[in-house]
Curated annotation (Swiss-Prot):
Coiled coil: none annotated. Pfam families: PDCD2_C. One of its GO terms (biological process) is apoptotic process. This is Programmed cell death protein 2-like. GO terms for cellular component: cytoplasm.
């Protein structure tokens, strides 16, 4: 008997994130699913501040996904970044996805899903934010104080005389044997300050919470008029018979002669299947299915699965985890005409979700970007 397909969860844009960082016992920012804003940092992990591999600019933060796995003791966070320079949008080196993990106790985790996850001793997409409406975190306009707190530098910004005197006193008490430790501490502090500068120089999109729904539960409750309108517009512009083509995609692809009569451009068959799948919920901005199958918007390269690189840390295979959907494009906005365009962005992560002991920086995972074959379909 074939194994059941992994469940699929959808991410939808919710309320705008406003106000200061949460506190007073409320959930920490890193336990938040959000689009835009700045990436949050897990305890004991420095925030990632990636730069574009093409132009060198600081990458903008697109999406944060809090995604602990059921059989793992780790908090787990994935952040997707992209270059906001239009010349870089379609370049693979202009996109980054960083995975962070922390062994902090999850018994009282911020999303309130600890008890449920303890009952599920398997890695499942169901573990992604079972109580996703319990939000926390900083918005895209977070203060410099909040940024310093994330980087652990809030104590280093004061220039008061009393603190200077205290520093002098501490230095006078140092022994020569402590010199190496001091040097290492200073180097770490300088590195953190450099990362802070990089983080604050990156463009920032307006931030919104992401709410989560189960694809199986969501089906049948939405009006599909919007999706049907998009498909009809495409049919009129390209002169193709969409109903005939999509019926073939589900009935089988053994009728090449009929397919050719539609005079469809190369890649359209994949595009129509993509549109058919998302038509029930065209406003979805994120699709999550750990270990499942991605939806390609155009035909991927031949033998694509074999080209997905193994985990650079442990050498294990990578599996599909989530993808960014076309509707996200129109929801990414900021000052000075800030924008990023794409068709879909597919993220593959280590199947073991490895995390080295004492790791203090995020691990980079594999990201595959497909450009939109016709961006105006999703405006």
């Amino acid at each position: 008997m074939a194994a059941a397909a992994p469940p699929v969860l959808r991410g939808l844009r919710d309320a705008a994130m406003v106000g200061p960082c949460r506190g007073g016992g409320e959930p920490p920012g890193w336990a938040t699913n959000k689009l835009g804003g700045r990436a949050d940092a897990l305890p004991s992990v420095r925030p990632g501040c990636p730069r574009c591999g093409a132009c060198g600019a600081a990458l903008a933060h697109l999406v944060q996904v809090y995604c602990p796995l059921g059989a793992s003791p780790f908090h787990r966070l994935a952040n997707v970044f992209a270059c906001a320079e239009s010349a870089c949008w379609g370049r693979p080196q202009s996109w980054k996805v960083l995975r962070s993990q922390s062994l902090e106790a999850r018994g009282q985790d911020a999303l309130g899903c600890g008890s449920k996850q303890k009952e599920e001793c398997n890695f499942s997409a169901k573990d992604w934010c079972a109580e996703a409406d319990d939000w926390g975190g900083c918005d895209g306009t977070e203060s410099s104080t909040c940024a310093l707190q994330m980087l652990g530098l809030n104590a280093g910004m004061s220039s008061s005389a009393s603190e200077e005197a205290q520093c002098v006193s501490q230095l006078q008490e140092l022994h020569l044997s402590e010199a190496a430790d001091v040097s290492g501490s200073l180097n770490t502090d300088l590195l953190l300050r450099e990362e802070m500068v990089m983080a604050t120089s990156a463009p920032v999109f307006h931030s919104y919470y992401i709410s989560v729904v189960d694809e199986a539960d969501y089906a049948g409750f939405l009006d599909t008029d919007h999706a049907n309108k998009l498909l009809k517009e495409y049919q009129q512009r390209e002169g193709v018979d969409l109903e005939h083509l999509m019926s073939e995609s589900f009935a089988g692809e053994d009728s090449n002669e009929k397919y050719e009569k539609t005079k469809v451009r190369s890649g359209d068959h994949t595009f129509h299947k993509f549109m058919k799948r998302i038509s029930v919920c065209p406003e979805q901005i994120l699709r999550y299915s750990w270990g499942g199958q991605p939806l390609f918007i155009t035909c991927p390269p031949a033998n694509f699965d074999n080209s997905i690189p193994a985990c650079s840390n442990c050498g294990s295979n990578r599996v599909f985890e989530f993808q960014l959907m076309p509707a996200l494009v129109s929801m990414l906005w900021g000052d000075a005409d800030l924008s990023v365009e794409f068709g879909t962005v597919i993220v593959y992560t280590c199947e073991r979700s490895c995390w080295p002991t004492n790791q203090q920086t995020p691990l980079e995972e594999f990201i595959f970007v497909q450009e939109d074959p016709d961006q105006k379909l999703f405006k």
